[in-house]
Amino acid sequence: MTTILKHLPVGQRIGIAFSGGLDTSAALLWMRQKGAVPYAYTANLGQPDEEDYDAIPRRAMEYGAENARLIDCRKQLVAEGIAAIQCGAFHNTTGGLTYFNTTPLGRAVTGTMLVAAMKEDGVNIWGDGSTYKGNDIERFYRYGLLTNAELQIYKPWLDTDFIDELGGRHEMSEFMIACGFDYKMSVEKAYSTDSNMLGATHEAKDLEYLNSSVKIVNPIMGVKFWDESVKIPAEEVTVRFEQGHPVALNGKTFSDDVEMLLEANRIGGRHGLGMSDQIENRIIEAKSRGIYEAPGMALLHIAYERLLTGIHNEDTIEQYHAHGRQLGRLLYQGRWFDSQALMLRDSLQRWVASQITGEVTLELRRGNDYSILNTVSENLTYKPERLTMEKGDSVFSPDDRIGQLTMRNLDITDTREKLFGYAKTGLLSSSATSGVPQVENLENKGQ
């Protein structure tokens, strides 16, 4: 069976991921007019820039949908977001600022839940608005087929007939008007935005040029912290985790994770926390650039990693970072539910997150400027009395340390001999009396 359909399957049911925007509206209307039977599915991901979700299915029906459904994906999305924090599943960082993989997380949820809803309705052909140059076309492809092995893919934006007739936004707008719908194009921004309640992505157009900075972006989850005219008073906030799960903010306990994240977004957003500018590698190995917002994810991540460093030993923390980066890349590639990702998730949640219990107090200022004011946990292995510089009882004595240092003579001797060996073969230039490379010796030999 052909998985990807290049032309419209006339007379068949097609499920379209319907956002209500110009692209999917024109595509739905065009498919109906050409003889297909479109079904519209809208994911409620808690997008901060969406005002009326209930109106979206109604518009789909007006444009010719056989049926239109609104699928509430918020609970699942937040669950996956918390799992990503527990695992440190983030691999794109620049200068210490993290991209929290909010779009890949949204695609994992959308791609599985919408296709599951389509399957319930007997719809086995899926279309969405992803383009052939981006990551989403592959993410949706993988998640869709994981959910429904019989699924076929039809994307109007890969159909030459559709492109020839409605290849641009102007043509789409004119098409809608000609069909009796007073659809006006929204005001063109200098970039495009995609969002869910975990975060927002701003990319393309002017942001493709690296001399266009974050300053051209109007945040939808935060504030312009770079604008000195924007008043942002400092604010103290406490975050509490129990067994790796965020449960309370500023002393208020949440039984609903969705409400917890919304509050975290409000707190972090007041300061512009979690905004970052990243150059990343797309799945196809080409580089792209995005500016990201994720105020709630950033707030939870900071508190989580503070507890992590105070609770776990060095080797565990090293494995958390290494496996987290590996898992983040799998998530980015649309492999969040693949076996290799599930293996990493299970180990990180079981052996790392389960011990993260405690409370962190932060002072948030402007943007990603913050201070950690206090860290409290019954599981802390940080114990200041062990290494206090004050006089008193100690868990080890000066003689104990002398013995420990003496044992280091073995590997120090080995290292010294290797340095001399490197010098003899010309790999290093060293002094006559030691094997240690020195700047002046390198300069003298022009190496």
Curated annotation (Swiss-Prot):
ATP binds at residues 17-25, 43, 129, 131, 136, 194. GO terms for cellular component: cytoplasm. This is Argininosuccinate synthase. It catalyses: L-citrulline + L-aspartate + ATP = 2-(N(omega)-L-arginino)succinate + AMP + diphosphate + H(+). Signal peptide: none annotated. Gene3D superfamilies: 1.10.287.400, Argininosuccinate synthetase, chain A, domain 2 (3.90.1260.10), HUPs (3.40.50.620). GO terms for biological process: argininosuccinate metabolic process; L-arginine biosynthetic process; urea cycle.
